[in-house]
Amino acid sequence: MFNRLNKFQAALALALYSQSALGQYYSNSTSISSNSSSTSVVSSSSGSVSISSSIAETSSSATDILSSITQSASSTSGVSSSVGPSSSSVVSSSVSQSSSSVSDVSSSVSQSSSSASDVSSSVSQSASSTSDVSSSVSQSSSSASDVSSSVSQSSSSASDVSSSVSQSASSASDVSSSVSQSASSTSDVSSSVSQSSSSASDVSSSVSQSSSSASDVSSSVSQSASSTSDVSSSVSQSASSTSGVSSSGSQSVSSASGSSSSFPQSTSSASTASGSATSNSLSSITSSASSASATASNSLSSSDGTIYLPTTTISGDLTLTGKVIATEGVVVAAGAKLTLLDGDKYSFSADLKVYGDLLVKKSKETYPGTEFDISGENFDVTGNFNAEESAATSASIYSFTPSSFDNSGDISLSLSKSKKGEVTFSPYSNSGAFSFSNAILNGGSVSGLQRRDDTEGSVNNGEINLDNGSTYVIVEPVSGKGTVNIISGNLYLHYPDTFTGQTVVFKGEGVLAVDPTETNATPIPVVGYTGKNQIAITADITALSYDGTTGVLTATQGNRQFSFAIGTGFSSSDFSVSEGIFAGAYAYYLNYNGVVATSAASSSTASGASASVTGSTSFGASVTGSTASTSFGASVTGSTASTSFGASVTGSTSVYTTTLDYVNATSTVVVSCSETTDSNGNVYTITTTVPCSSTTATITSCDETGCHVSTSTGAVVTETVSSKSYTTATVTHCDDNGCNTKTVTSECSKETSATTASPKSYTTVTVTHCDDNGCNTKTVTSEAPEATTTTTVSSQSYTTATVTHCDDNGCKTKTVTSEAPEATTTTVSPKTYTTATVTQCDDNGCSTKTVTSECPEETSATTTSPKSYTTVTVTHCDDNGCNTKTVTSEAPEATTTTVSPKTYTTATVTQCDDNGCSTKTVTSEAPKETSETSETSAAPKDIHYCHWLLNGDDNGCNVKIITSKIPEATSTVTQLVLLQSHTLLSLLRVLKQPH
């Protein structure tokens, strides 16, 4: 008896010391009072093989006993905190652990396992074949060999154990002295501990057995088992699939005398308790900032508005109300549902795996847009991820930027309407469905929409749905075999050549917009194109063509081409281009059959894309919604259209057309009816086109069927009202930077009589300008003169001449363009230019030049001979050698039928001296002609001739040349004598040659 008392006192001291230590460490611990007077024991196992507990026995004088005990089930491997077990972590400090593979647990831990090898410091452990136990710790394991520090022993056949001993065995039948008992057949136990085993049917609160005189024993224990059916306690509970339960809240049970033992629950972000739910056990917990209290509710909320999730697996239905921050992995298991209610911010910075359902909901009528951020390692969806907050008063911001983004389920975001929600995401792999409503999507997850490498692109083998004005801006490469469905939205491709394998399907009205950055080698398949749903290029379109055989529509912009496989059955003559606005910049819309898109929904350009169209290629189709062409001066901004009738329409619109018959003629007119609502409550505009000839009618009323005209006889218009209309001309403007095509729209002239007035027109000529830097081609566009009579007036024209300019640096070709003279008679000859080629030679060599001069104006019907030039080649020789030059002179003006130009005579002279012989050429002007057929011209220059002089001395013979001036030739006879003299000189030269 004395020994038992000593053992009891030792156990009591150890318990009190443990309580003091726990109280100092877990400063936020609180206590929950209990009326039970018992020790606290928890012990269970799925197979009822081992039960462990560090229990002290009480007597009549026992006052305080602390027992920090927890128990886990067959699949539990580790727990973080002194609450229920988990299957994913290892814990220290007041933690119970039980698993088939548990090897080590430290500090105040109860352990049970078939392979437990080592446990230290106040650990209760049990097994069927314990061989040696020492100190106040019970140990069990099939191979347990040694445990130190006050341990009591138990075995499979123990029937009675006394003192501070905990016992557990598969066949345990009787345990005495404040010991908790559990076995495979346990049916009923009471006390402040939750307990369960494989066949447990009912367990309630604080389980322990104590002597009749025991006064106070308290303990808080969490317990789990593989087949728990019903458990209630102020403790979190988990089953075989539990991954973790943690919280900084403390749970405690105290006796009437004030003794308590608390098991704080803590995590790294100490604030909230959360449990992973099993079928019928507690599925959600309500927690406060500092303490966790167990309730059997189905929601988890926080008093300060923030819920911190630890590593959690959700296996049932769980609702989290308020802001949620998860810094560890969260898994929504298949068949489970996690509802995030009324939070304005959600952050998942670790893995988020949705195999069941994750719902973002609002219960209030008004609320701000949600900020939802996923930035962990993996975002994996095989179930459903759904967010519904279309009534948000500010923009919803969703950011999906994990390292790996994989969706094979369904992600659906219906975001704020008042200001389009924004979605940013990193490259993804999608084999399921993305559905977006009221959203602006920026792929690439970077601001500024920077292009990504091809290896960093997305893969879409599923569907992407764009509805209610959603715009998907694609910067990163997208490959795969998926589809993008434009229900009522826009798809904006910055790099169309990297958008491969995808099919764009128009299921409503919207816009497929393409930046002219790169030619797409393969046509983009487009299904459902009608013209109401449009294709736009965000730069000037210089050409548009359609191949009826292949069904490919090709738009050309400069040297780039963008092709779309829209299918066969279209008429190439019915395509046109209209200018408008998309994403805050000018765009050119590819229209078909005069139909203009009506629902390219607009949005603020700061956050996404806006679309509207103005201008036209034919007669100016009218405007509806935020996409249309101007007519009657109508203009579109956002979703407001106006016409010259002063009517205006706001909001989304539908297009109606009407044909008016009057005065034996049929005309289609353009009208806008303001604030007209159809049977479905939609505001609409009735629009058609009017030609520039301005057919007129009086519109008295409009309804859903069209516009109506009041007439006196039912067929004739009672009153006419002229409307403004517009013509559009395409002008190509060229400068040093290249050529750009612009569209000029002018107002048609007012009708002043029955005669149709000719509209203004433009004349375009191409001019090639050359300078030292090269040649550039420019296009000059001028307005044609207004018609003043029925006589056709020739418009201004330009004459272009090519001039080759040569200097010492070489020859360059220039083009000179001048304005032709105005027409003053029926036929007016324009100015012309005469071009002569001149070869100029100097000491540096010869250069060819071209001289262009203007022809004289005509003064009569007689053709005037233009000025001409005579070119002769002159070889100049001196001591340095001979150079050939070309002399060009202007021919005399013609005063009679024939005018003989001046001529030149050239003679070759060989000069010899002591240094040798040099050949020179002397050119002189020929004598005047004195015959009747020639007009005497200016006196010719003096003519020189050369003769040979032979000198002989003792050194040999030398040849010298003496040059003499001869009188002017007065007849052809003199010229003959000169010729003979030159012949003689040549002969003497031959005779003088040394033999």
From Swiss-Prot:
Belongs to the SRP1/TIP1 family. Secreted protein that may be involved in cell wall organization and biosynthesis. Residues 1-23 form the signal peptide. This is Secreted protein CSS1. Residues 98-276 are annotated as: Disordered. Induction: Expression is induced in both high and low pH environments. Residues 26-253 form the Methyl-accepting transducer domain. Keywords: Glycoprotein, Secreted, Signal. GO terms for cellular component: cell periphery; chromatin; extracellular region; fungal-type cell wall; membrane; PTW/PP1 phosphatase complex. Glycans are attached at residues 28, 35, 468, 664. The keyword Kinase does not apply. The keyword Glycoprotein applies. It is found in: Secreted. Disruption phenotype: Decreases haze protective activity in white wine. One of its GO terms (molecular function) is protein phosphatase 1 binding. One of its GO terms (biological process) is signal transduction. It comes from the Eukaryota. Pfam families: Hyphal_reg_CWP (PF11765). PANTHER family: SERINE/THREONINE-PROTEIN PHOSPHATASE 1 REGULATORY SUBUNIT 10-RELATED, SERINE_THREONINE-PROTEIN PHOSPHATASE 1 REGULATORY SUBUNIT 10.
